[in-house]
Amino acid sequence: MHVVGIMGSPRRDSNTEILLDAALAGAAECGATTEKVAVCELHILPCTECYHCAVDGTCSIKDDMSHLYDVIVSADRIILASPVFFYGLTSQAKALVDRCQALWMRRRVLKSWMPDLEARKGALIAVGATSGPKLFDGVLLTAKYFFDAVGVRDFDHLLVRGLDGRAQVRDYPEHISRATELGRSLAAG
């Protein structure tokens, strides 16, 4: 069992990263191998909508995303983690999500990659500063279609409101415990 965590925060030691680390630790407790992808440290350009991926399922842009396709395809479990920026993912996380159009093409158009949808699972961790009732609506919708593109039918989520300061989540051990349990559940299920 291999669990890949995609850390979409633009800064390190963020609330998002702390929760993702807890989830990955929970998965590791259940015997899973884990890998964290810190998108903020990678060079991932936005999708240019050139449709090169419609030809053979590969992206024409050569950057750090080239390696991540293999990481995503080989994962048994995927955790997408992002703070909420204007009711959506960060631009760093969204660039990675948009570039997964190549995987969607492989799966849905070219039929060259057919993952076992029953075996692959996912999770979303989203952290927002406000308490608005629709705070996570955009993130959840984007996550739904990201997970579809990467061959994940079912995903769980941890949505945390009211955190804005760097590493503020450390003052709320219940959120960290929930993230650890999310990782355990993901690895066990």
Predicted segments, located by residue:
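Active-site-proximal alpha-helix that buttresses catalytic centers in soluble enzyme cores
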Residues: 21, 25-30, 38-39, 52-55, ...
